Design a protein with these regions (language model features):
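N-terminal membrane-targeting hydrophobic helices
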Residues: 1-177
Length: 177
């Protein structure tokens, strides 16, 4: 899927949280502020494609892109597993414990990390709708998982994003669930 589509999906999800939880929500005793998470969701949406040198994040971080591509199994390798979101979650817990005395700072840091992680997870989610899939359960299970085979570029990818955002809007308006 194209980077812009990933960003649209990740950012729409973060915006959805802004509408659903305008005052924030509790995550392990720290208030996550969705409006702050929104700031890093788009970066997180781009991040998994650092394993491909021709992508936005791959071009910005060429050396890291080459190394990750080589040791991580190429495109849709290690960066398209749940390993990185789990590492980010552990980092959030560590940050929360370390910054416990500074509640405002803890909330800021956790919100920024949460947004980045949300974008990352939404990137992987969107790639599950491509025939190539993602090795989301690596290293526990080998093989790639995919839900269905939708186009990963062009109008098909944008239609997927539009349908996804429309579902979020329906949920917000109470027309779904």
């Amino acid at each position: 899927m194209q980077g812009k589509v990933h960003v649209a999906i990740g950012t729409a999800t973060a915006a959805f949280l802004c509408v659903q939880y305008p005052n924030g929500f509790d995550l392990g005793g720290v208030n996550v502020i969705p409006y702050i998470a929104l700031l890093t969701a788009s970066a997180g949406s781009y991040a998994p494609d650092i394993d491909m040198q021709t992508t936005h994040s791959g071009k910005k971080h060429k050396t890291a892109s080459k190394v990750i591509n080589k040791i991580g199994g190429g495109h849709r390798g290690i960066t398209h597993t749940l390993l990185f979101p789990v590492i980010l979650y552990v980092l959030m817990i560590f940050s929360q414990n370390y910054l416990q005395a500074y509640s405002g700072l803890a909330s800021l840091v956790i919100s920024l990390l949460f947004g980045f992680e949300l974008g990352w997870i939404m990137h992987i989610f969107a790639d599950l709708f491509n025939g190539k899939g993602c090795p989301i359960f690596w290293p526990i299970m080998q093989g790639k998982v995919h839900i269905m085979d939708l186009p990963s570029s062009g109008i098909g990818a944008w239609l997927f994003a539009i349908v996804y955002v429309s579902i979020l809007v329906l949920i917000i308006r109470g027309g779904l669930f």
